[in-house]
Protein backbone atom coordinates (compact mmCIF):
# COMPACT_ATOMS: atom_id res chain seq x y z
CA UNK A 1 0.00 0.00 0.00
CA UNK A 2 2.77 2.44 0.93
CA UNK A 3 4.59 1.71 -2.34
CA UNK A 4 1.38 2.58 -4.23
CA UNK A 5 0.70 5.80 -2.33
CA UNK A 6 4.23 7.16 -2.03
CA UNK A 7 4.70 8.51 -5.61
CA UNK A 8 1.34 10.29 -5.47
CA UNK A 9 2.07 11.60 -1.99
CA UNK A 10 5.49 12.89 -3.08
CA UNK A 11 3.93 14.56 -6.14
CA UNK A 12 1.31 16.22 -3.94
CA UNK A 13 3.92 17.42 -1.44
CA UNK A 14 6.00 18.98 -4.21
CA UNK A 15 2.95 20.68 -5.71
CA UNK A 16 2.03 22.02 -2.26
CA UNK A 17 5.46 23.68 -2.05
CA UNK A 18 4.64 25.71 -5.17
CA UNK A 19 0.92 26.15 -4.53
CA UNK A 20 1.44 27.66 -1.06
CA UNK A 21 3.29 30.88 -1.98
CA UNK A 22 1.64 31.14 -5.40
CA UNK A 23 -1.81 30.63 -3.93
CA UNK A 24 -1.14 33.46 -1.50
CA UNK A 25 -0.80 35.87 -4.42
CA UNK A 26 -3.88 34.36 -6.07
CA UNK A 27 -5.85 35.13 -2.90
CA UNK A 28 -4.33 38.57 -2.33
CA UNK A 29 -4.87 39.66 -5.93
CA UNK A 30 -8.27 37.94 -6.26
CA UNK A 31 -7.10 35.89 -9.24
CA UNK A 32 -9.14 32.76 -8.55
CA UNK A 33 -11.25 33.21 -11.68
CA UNK A 34 -8.08 33.61 -13.72
CA UNK A 35 -6.88 30.31 -12.30
CA UNK A 36 -10.18 28.65 -13.18
CA UNK A 37 -9.88 29.92 -16.75
CA UNK A 38 -6.42 28.39 -17.15
CA UNK A 39 -7.54 25.16 -15.47
CA UNK A 40 -10.52 24.77 -17.80
CA UNK A 41 -8.37 25.59 -20.81
CA UNK A 42 -5.91 22.87 -19.81
CA UNK A 43 -8.32 20.28 -21.19
CA UNK A 44 -7.91 21.96 -24.57
CA UNK A 45 -4.19 21.30 -24.21
CA UNK A 46 -4.94 17.62 -23.65
CA UNK A 47 -7.05 17.56 -26.82
CA UNK A 48 -4.34 19.25 -28.90
CA UNK A 49 -1.70 16.92 -27.51
CA UNK A 50 -3.70 13.84 -28.49
CA UNK A 51 -4.61 15.33 -31.86
CA UNK A 52 -1.00 16.20 -32.73
CA UNK A 53 0.43 13.05 -31.15
CA UNK A 54 2.35 15.09 -28.57
CA UNK A 55 2.66 14.27 -24.88
CA UNK A 56 -0.50 15.88 -23.38
CA UNK A 57 1.52 16.94 -20.32
CA UNK A 58 3.65 19.32 -22.41
CA UNK A 59 0.71 20.35 -24.60
CA UNK A 60 -1.21 21.44 -21.48
CA UNK A 61 1.71 23.54 -20.28
CA UNK A 62 2.07 25.15 -23.72
CA UNK A 63 -1.65 25.99 -23.99
CA UNK A 64 -1.90 27.43 -20.48
CA UNK A 65 1.22 29.56 -21.00
CA UNK A 66 -0.10 30.87 -24.33
CA UNK A 67 -3.50 31.61 -22.83
CA UNK A 68 -1.93 33.44 -19.88
CA UNK A 69 0.05 35.64 -22.26
CA UNK A 70 -3.08 36.26 -24.32
CA UNK A 71 -5.05 37.28 -21.24
CA UNK A 72 -2.38 39.80 -20.27
CA UNK A 73 -2.59 41.27 -23.77
CA UNK A 74 -6.40 41.39 -23.77
CA UNK A 75 -6.46 42.94 -20.30
CA UNK A 76 -4.96 46.10 -21.79
CA UNK A 77 -7.92 46.44 -24.15
CA UNK A 78 -10.99 47.34 -22.09
CA UNK A 79 -13.69 46.45 -24.63
CA UNK A 80 -14.98 43.82 -22.18
CA UNK A 81 -14.80 43.55 -18.41
CA UNK A 82 -12.05 41.13 -17.41
CA UNK A 83 -14.41 38.81 -15.51
CA UNK A 84 -16.67 38.57 -18.58
CA UNK A 85 -13.68 37.83 -20.77
CA UNK A 86 -12.40 35.17 -18.38
CA UNK A 87 -15.81 33.51 -18.23
CA UNK A 88 -16.09 33.38 -22.02
CA UNK A 89 -12.58 31.99 -22.47
CA UNK A 90 -12.86 29.45 -19.65
CA UNK A 91 -16.03 27.76 -20.82
CA UNK A 92 -15.24 28.11 -24.52
CA UNK A 93 -11.85 26.43 -24.09
CA UNK A 94 -13.31 23.67 -21.90
CA UNK A 95 -16.14 23.02 -24.38
CA UNK A 96 -13.78 23.01 -27.37
CA UNK A 97 -11.49 20.57 -25.59
CA UNK A 98 -14.38 18.22 -24.79
CA UNK A 99 -15.69 18.38 -28.38
CA UNK A 100 -12.25 17.70 -29.90
CA UNK A 101 -11.67 14.76 -27.56
CA UNK A 102 -15.11 13.30 -28.33
CA UNK A 103 -14.36 13.45 -32.07
CA UNK A 104 -11.27 11.25 -31.68
CA UNK A 105 -13.01 7.94 -32.18
CA UNK A 106 -9.70 6.12 -32.73
CA UNK A 107 -8.21 7.24 -29.40
CA UNK A 108 -9.41 6.04 -26.02
CA UNK A 109 -9.41 8.96 -23.58
CA UNK A 110 -10.22 8.76 -19.87
CA UNK A 111 -11.90 12.14 -19.42
CA UNK A 112 -12.51 11.55 -15.72
CA UNK A 113 -8.77 11.29 -15.13
CA UNK A 114 -8.19 14.67 -16.78
CA UNK A 115 -11.20 16.35 -15.17
CA UNK A 116 -10.53 15.10 -11.64
CA UNK A 117 -6.93 13.90 -11.83
CA UNK A 118 -5.29 10.71 -10.65
CA UNK A 119 -2.58 11.19 -8.04
CA UNK A 120 -2.16 7.44 -7.75
CA UNK A 121 -1.04 7.08 -11.38
CA UNK A 122 2.18 9.06 -10.94
CA UNK A 123 5.26 7.61 -12.63
CA UNK A 124 8.95 8.32 -11.91
CA UNK A 125 9.04 10.42 -15.10
CA UNK A 126 6.07 12.43 -13.81
CA UNK A 127 7.91 13.09 -10.54
CA UNK A 128 10.89 14.46 -12.44
CA UNK A 129 8.65 16.76 -14.51
CA UNK A 130 6.83 17.96 -11.39
CA UNK A 131 10.11 18.58 -9.57
CA UNK A 132 11.46 20.67 -12.46
CA UNK A 133 8.24 22.69 -12.67
CA UNK A 134 8.10 23.27 -8.91
CA UNK A 135 11.75 24.38 -8.76
CA UNK A 136 11.14 26.87 -11.59
CA UNK A 137 8.00 28.26 -9.93
CA UNK A 138 9.55 28.57 -6.46
CA UNK A 139 12.74 30.11 -7.86
CA UNK A 140 10.81 32.77 -9.80
CA UNK A 141 8.60 33.59 -6.82
CA UNK A 142 11.66 33.89 -4.56
CA UNK A 143 13.42 36.08 -7.14
CA UNK A 144 10.44 38.39 -7.65
CA UNK A 145 8.90 38.17 -4.16
CA UNK A 146 9.58 41.80 -3.24
CA UNK A 147 8.32 43.15 -6.56
CA UNK A 148 5.21 40.96 -6.44
CA UNK A 149 4.43 42.13 -2.91
CA UNK A 150 4.93 45.78 -3.86
CA UNK A 151 2.65 45.41 -6.88
CA UNK A 152 0.01 43.67 -4.77
CA UNK A 153 0.06 46.20 -1.91
CA UNK A 154 0.22 49.37 -4.00
CA UNK A 155 0.80 49.39 -7.77
CA UNK A 156 1.37 53.15 -7.72
CA UNK A 157 4.12 52.96 -5.11
CA UNK A 158 5.63 49.97 -6.88
CA UNK A 159 5.73 51.97 -10.11
CA UNK A 160 7.45 54.87 -8.33
CA UNK A 161 10.00 52.42 -6.91
CA UNK A 162 10.84 51.33 -10.46
CA UNK A 163 8.95 48.04 -10.58
CA UNK A 164 8.01 47.13 -14.15
CA UNK A 165 4.37 46.34 -13.39
CA UNK A 166 3.39 44.73 -16.70
CA UNK A 167 6.44 42.50 -16.74
CA UNK A 168 5.90 41.37 -13.13
CA UNK A 169 2.18 40.79 -13.74
CA UNK A 170 2.96 38.74 -16.86
CA UNK A 171 5.51 36.74 -14.88
CA UNK A 172 2.95 35.99 -12.15
CA UNK A 173 0.37 34.84 -14.69
CA UNK A 174 2.92 32.66 -16.50
CA UNK A 175 4.00 31.08 -13.22
CA UNK A 176 0.35 30.41 -12.38
CA UNK A 177 -0.13 28.86 -15.82
CA UNK A 178 2.95 26.67 -15.38
CA UNK A 179 1.76 25.44 -11.98
CA UNK A 180 -1.69 24.60 -13.33
CA UNK A 181 -0.18 22.89 -16.37
CA UNK A 182 2.11 20.76 -14.22
CA UNK A 183 -0.57 19.84 -11.67
CA UNK A 184 -3.53 19.32 -14.00
CA UNK A 185 -2.85 15.65 -14.76
CA UNK A 186 -2.65 14.77 -11.09
CA UNK A 187 -5.37 16.93 -9.54
CA UNK A 188 -7.72 17.52 -12.47
CA UNK A 189 -8.91 20.47 -14.52
CA UNK A 190 -12.06 21.08 -12.49
CA UNK A 191 -10.55 21.21 -8.99
CA UNK A 192 -6.95 22.30 -9.46
CA UNK A 193 -7.58 25.95 -8.55
CA UNK A 194 -8.86 24.87 -5.15
CA UNK A 195 -5.36 23.69 -4.22
CA UNK A 196 -4.13 27.23 -4.84
CA UNK A 197 -6.95 28.98 -3.00
CA UNK A 198 -7.97 26.85 -0.01
CA UNK A 199 -4.57 26.39 1.71
CA UNK A 200 -3.77 30.08 1.25
CA UNK A 201 -7.19 31.15 2.54
CA UNK A 202 -6.71 28.86 5.55
CA UNK A 203 -3.22 30.21 6.24
CA UNK A 204 -4.46 33.78 6.04
CA UNK A 205 -6.32 33.32 9.33
CA UNK A 206 -3.14 32.50 11.25
CA UNK A 207 -0.34 34.45 9.56
CA UNK A 208 0.78 37.96 10.42
CA UNK A 209 3.19 38.50 7.54
CA UNK A 210 3.12 37.52 3.85
CA UNK A 211 6.02 35.15 4.38
CA UNK A 212 4.22 33.43 7.26
CA UNK A 213 1.11 33.05 5.14
CA UNK A 214 3.08 31.42 2.31
CA UNK A 215 4.78 29.03 4.74
CA UNK A 216 1.58 28.07 6.56
CA UNK A 217 -0.16 27.56 3.19
CA UNK A 218 2.54 25.06 2.24
CA UNK A 219 2.01 23.17 5.52
CA UNK A 220 -1.78 23.18 5.05
CA UNK A 221 -1.32 21.82 1.53
CA UNK A 222 0.96 19.05 2.79
CA UNK A 223 -1.51 18.06 5.51
CA UNK A 224 -4.35 18.07 2.95
CA UNK A 225 -2.37 15.86 0.57
CA UNK A 226 -1.46 13.40 3.33
CA UNK A 227 -4.95 13.30 4.81
CA UNK A 228 -6.69 13.14 1.44
CA UNK A 229 -4.55 10.28 0.13
CA UNK A 230 -4.98 8.36 3.38
CA UNK A 231 -8.75 8.79 3.17
CA UNK A 232 -8.66 7.74 -0.49
CA UNK A 233 -6.72 4.59 0.33
CA UNK A 234 -8.96 3.58 3.24
CA UNK A 235 -12.35 4.32 1.66
CA UNK A 236 -11.46 3.86 -2.05
CA UNK A 237 -12.44 7.40 -3.06
CA UNK A 238 -10.90 9.50 -5.88
CA UNK A 239 -7.54 10.86 -4.72
CA UNK A 240 -7.78 14.41 -6.11
CA UNK A 241 -11.24 15.24 -4.74
CA UNK A 242 -10.29 13.63 -1.42
CA UNK A 243 -7.30 15.97 -1.10
CA UNK A 244 -9.46 19.00 -1.90
CA UNK A 245 -12.11 17.84 0.58
CA UNK A 246 -9.46 17.52 3.28
CA UNK A 247 -8.21 21.04 2.50
CA UNK A 248 -11.77 22.37 2.70
CA UNK A 249 -12.22 20.67 6.08
CA UNK A 250 -9.06 22.36 7.36
CA UNK A 251 -10.43 25.71 6.17
CA UNK A 252 -13.73 25.14 7.99
CA UNK A 253 -11.86 24.17 11.17
CA UNK A 254 -9.72 27.31 10.89
CA UNK A 255 -12.86 29.44 10.67
CA UNK A 256 -14.36 27.75 13.72
CA UNK A 257 -11.15 28.16 15.72
CA UNK A 258 -10.84 31.83 14.77
CA UNK A 259 -14.43 32.52 15.79
CA UNK A 260 -13.99 30.67 19.08
CA UNK A 261 -10.92 32.74 19.94
UniProtKB/Swiss-Prot annotation:
Residues 29-53, 105-121, 199-213, 257-261 are cytoplasmic. The gene is znuB. Keywords: Cell inner membrane, Cell membrane, Ion transport, Membrane, Transmembrane, Transmembrane helix, Transport, Zinc, Zinc transport. The keyword GTP-binding does not apply. One of its GO terms (molecular function) is high-affinity zinc transmembrane transporter activity. Pfam families: ABC-3 (PF00950). GO terms for cellular component: ATP-binding cassette (ABC) transporter complex, substrate-binding subunit-containing; membrane; plasma membrane. Residues 1-7, 75-83, 143-177, 235 are periplasmic. One of its GO terms (biological process) is zinc ion import across plasma membrane. This is High-affinity zinc uptake system membrane protein ZnuB. InterPro entries: ABC_BtuC-like, ABC_TroCD. Its main location: membrane. PANTHER family: ABC-TRANSPORTER METAL-BINDING PROTEIN, HIGH-AFFINITY ZINC UPTAKE SYSTEM MEMBRANE PROTEIN ZNUB. The keyword Nucleotide-binding does not apply. The chain crosses the membrane at residues 8-28, 54-74, 84-104, 122-142, 178-198, 214-234, 236-256. NCBIfam families: PRK09543.1. Belongs to the ABC-3 integral membrane protein family. It is a multi-pass membrane protein. SUPFAM superfamilies: ABC transporter involved in vitamin B12 uptake, BtuC (SSF81345).
Amino acid sequence: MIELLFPGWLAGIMLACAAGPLGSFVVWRRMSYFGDTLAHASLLGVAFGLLLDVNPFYAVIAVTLLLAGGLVWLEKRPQLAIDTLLGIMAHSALSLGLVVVSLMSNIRVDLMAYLFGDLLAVTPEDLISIAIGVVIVVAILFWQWRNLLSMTISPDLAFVDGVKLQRVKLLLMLVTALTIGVAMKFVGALIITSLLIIPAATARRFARTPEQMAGVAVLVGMVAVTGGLTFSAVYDTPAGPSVVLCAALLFILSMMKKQAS
